[in-house]
């Protein structure tokens, strides 16, 4: 009996230690970003930094306004979500409820392959195929634009949304569907009015993963967006928060480097706010 209790205590201690490591890593990253990012904000001014419309970090009279980056990231992420979530969600319903077994194996393999493709490959294909296509189709001077970035991001978030949504839908107890069918509902009504609402927390988690992937992507975006610090427009070259950091960090110094850490802090806070909002709405729905 004592040996069993000792073993349980050891296992509990190991899991506690591993959990503390995870929490500690998050705290270290948070503290580091705050310590590194706040000096630039205090020097530039919070209002000028967040709402300034011009970024010229290497000019003689440097300007550090990141409003174009914030708006571009918001528009780009929202655009990717508007495209990626419906496609990913409906694909997940098809995979979990409708698809024949042989076809499901093929589709799941394709989704897994899509998830494993490196970001630079997405960017390369987008740069060689999508960007010229947009230029020819819409008769614009340069296809490297916000639209190209939205399309690439929408494709990149599909695997996360599909996989997590499929897992959530398959976790719904079969008794729910059996009861619905017994009451005379069709299969389609059962899937969308019973199974989907029951799996809404998992589907919401899939959406958050997609948002996080879209907000945090840099390599593919920098290859198809043009990476110009303009105010966002669908057919103009733009720069995201992530690409601003990635494109300038290698040669930055002084206030410019501090400002890049401030951008990273803003991006980090965006992710925290999105997660907090999701948890709030899920808890409210559960209570309601």
Task: State the predicted function of each range.
Residues 166-170, 174, 181, 250-288:
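C-terminal transmembrane helix and the adjacent membrane-cytosol boundary/short C-terminal tail
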Residues 66-94:
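Transmembrane alpha-helix signature in integral membrane proteins
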Residues 118, 183-184, 197:
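Glycine/proline-centered hinge or cleavage motifs at structural transition points of membrane proteins
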Residues 12, 87-126, 288:
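Cytoplasmic-entry segments and transmembrane alpha-helices of multi-pass inner-membrane transporters
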Residues 112-154:
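Generic hydrophobic transmembrane alpha-helix motif, especially the helices
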Residues 221-267:
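Interhelical loop and adjacent transmembrane-helix boundary motif
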């Amino acid at each position: 009996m004592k040996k069993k209790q000792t073993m349980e205590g050891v296992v509990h201690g190991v899991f506690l230690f591993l959990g503390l490591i995870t929490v500690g890593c998050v705290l270290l990253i948070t503290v580091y970003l705050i310590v590194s990012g706040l000096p630039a904000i205090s020097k530039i001014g919070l209002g000028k930094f967040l709402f300034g419309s011009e970024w010229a970090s290497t000019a003689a009279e440097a300007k550090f306004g990141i409003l174009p980056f914030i708006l571009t990231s918001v528009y780009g992420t929202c655009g990717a979500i508007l495209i990626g979530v419906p496609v990913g969600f409906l694909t997940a319903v098809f995979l979990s409820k409708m698809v024949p077994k042989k076809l499901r194996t093929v589709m799941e393999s394709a989704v897994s392959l899509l998830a494993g493709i490196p970001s630079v490959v997405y960017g390369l294909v987008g740069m060689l195929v999508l960007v010229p296509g947009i230029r020819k189709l819409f008769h614009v001077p340069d296809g490297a634009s916000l639209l190209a970035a939205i399309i690439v991001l929408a494709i990149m978030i599909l695997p996360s949304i599909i996989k997590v949504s499929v897992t959530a839908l398959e976790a719904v107890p079969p008794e729910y569907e059996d009861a619905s069918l017994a009451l005379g509902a069709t299969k389609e009504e059962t899937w969308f009015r019973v199974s989907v609402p029951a799996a809404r927390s998992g589907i919401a988690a899939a959406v958050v993963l997609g948002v996080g992937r879209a907000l945090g992507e840099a390599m593919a975006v920098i290859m198809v967006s043009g990476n110009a610090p303009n105010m966002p427009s669908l057919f103009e070259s733009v720069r995201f928060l992530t690409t601003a950091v990635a494109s300038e960090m290698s040669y930055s110094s002084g206030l410019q480097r501090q400002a890049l850490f401030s951008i990273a802090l803003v991006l980090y806070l965006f992710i925290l706010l999105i997660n907090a909002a999701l948890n709030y709405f899920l808890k409210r729905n559960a209570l309601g």
